[in-house]
Amino acid sequence: MNYFQAIILGIVQALTEYLPVSSSAHIRIFGDLMLGSDPGAAFTAIIQIGTELAVILYFRHDIINILTHWFSCLFGKNGKDWKARMGRGDNYATLGWNIIVGSIPIIILGFTLQNVIETSLRNLWITVTVLLVFGILLWMVDAKARQNKTMNDMTYRDAFLFGLGQSMALIPGVSRSGGTITVGRALGYTREAAVRLSFLMAIPAVFGSGLLEAIKAVKNYKTDAMFPGWGPTLVAMVISFVLGYIVIIGFLKFVSNFSYKAFAIYRIGLAVVVALLLIVGVLPAIDPSVVAAA
């Protein structure tokens, strides 16, 4: 991978990370088209740190409030009894606990299915299938969902279900935001609430997987045939951070006024295009280096 290709992939990551269209699927597809090979799970996870840093910058005030209220309830003067320590009566502290609960599914599944995630699940036929299925689900759920629950209405049950939706994004093509937004809309959350919860809940998961993949890349730098090198990877990460911040602003404005129908149609169209490219042999279903790593 050269630096121009890294810049393109950084732009693709920024444009698709927050939208319910699956950034990992786009990186997988564009990587094959530009490089002739899969950029790999490590590259994908590390450049996602850039877009997640943009989330932290944009939601910095919310994050500071969540952390200060959570610590104050758990360890400070606000934690008078166990109910208070669990955030009762404090929306920010409760949200902090909900983010923790929502992170449990992806932590468990990410560790237990790590080898499958990095090999078998990167098959483009799987990507095509989930792009299509979750595109239809998003369209149906968004059209029929109630729109009355806000972030403050979240329960531990809802948080866990959000987490299950997020963990589906371990399959390239599902989309982290697509999974959580679909669950959120099915549970009756407004579009704005579902999106903001999706952003905040992704922070621990993305940083956790990104840092783990970075550590693995350092250890296996000379033997990992798929990893494109630190120079291009860091360039792509920086690009995804800068452009990602702009995309967040635009996306939040969009969902305040429009439905997710356009994204659902895009997912279905992309699934059809990728399927055709697979059939005619332009794209391989799975990269040979992924098979070798299995």
Residues covered by each model-derived region:
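Multi-pass membrane proteins that catalyze or facilitate reactions on polyprenyl-/lipid-phosphate substrates
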Residues: 1-294
